[in-house]
A protein has these predicted regions:
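Carbohydrate-binding surfaces of carbohydrate-active enzymes
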Residues: 1-198
Length: 198
């Protein structure tokens, strides 16, 4: 676990196993680094954000505003039914969505809405604006949130490209050294921030 930093027991010499996580080219929550390697920037967000005041889907730009998100990637095994319904509503209006296989199968807590979620997800994944991406390196009983060395290779990048979703700034070839974030100010100016891993 590269987040751990120091091995249990601490100490000096061979007992010290510190690692700067900023130098590790690894996914933390979403495991694949293929999106960032190809210039895509992303954030982790709660489905509750989609219903927050001032957040809307802009049909003209085909983005979630005010953040400018061009697509959503759903990779967690849980998703609340209200969030799924909002995603379905926007996907019908043109929002691009990629669902990683095995994602959005359960609702939070024990709210009794798993069947409702399943119906929403079945309708969502049938839309032309939605793709289901396969995990290429997962065993049969793979759980995305178990601490196993699987789930790092998937079809999300290909699905986004098939949907026509491109990064605001992209590299000529995959880059394992730079991590970028793009922001736009009120005047419509884009800013690209790059972090160099090396």
């Amino acid at each position: 676990n590269w987040n751990q930093g120091l091995r249990y027991g601490g100490g000096t010499g061979n007992d010290l196993h510190g690692m700067n996580y900023l130098l590790a080219h690894m996914g933390v929550y979403y495991r694949s680094t293929e999106l960032q390697d190809n210039g895509y920037t992303y954030d982790y967000l709660s489905p509750d954000l989609l219903s927050a005041e001032g957040v809307y889907f802009d049909e003209e730009t085909q983005t979630i505003e005010l953040a400018g998100y061009k697509a959503l990637v759903i990779y967690q095994d849980w998703l609340d039914a209200d969030g799924a319904a909002k995603i379905l509503e926007w996907a019908k209006q043109g929002l691009k969505v990629v669902v990683l296989e095995g994602a959005a199968q359960l609702t939070l807590f024990n709210d009794g809405r798993d069947e409702e979620l399943a119906q929403i997800m079945a309708e969502l994944t049938a839309l032309d604006t939605v793709r289901v991406a396969e995990i290429y390196d997962a065993s049969e009983d793979f759980n995305y949130f178990d601490g196993v060395a699987e789930g790092y290779s998937d079809g999300v990048l290909e699905a986004l490209q098939e949907l026509g979703v491109t990064p605001y700034t992209q590299y000529i070839e995959p880059n394992h050294q730079l991590l970028g974030q793009t922001r736009m100010d009120d005047a419509g100016n884009y800013y690209l921030y790059l972090y160099n891993y090396c």
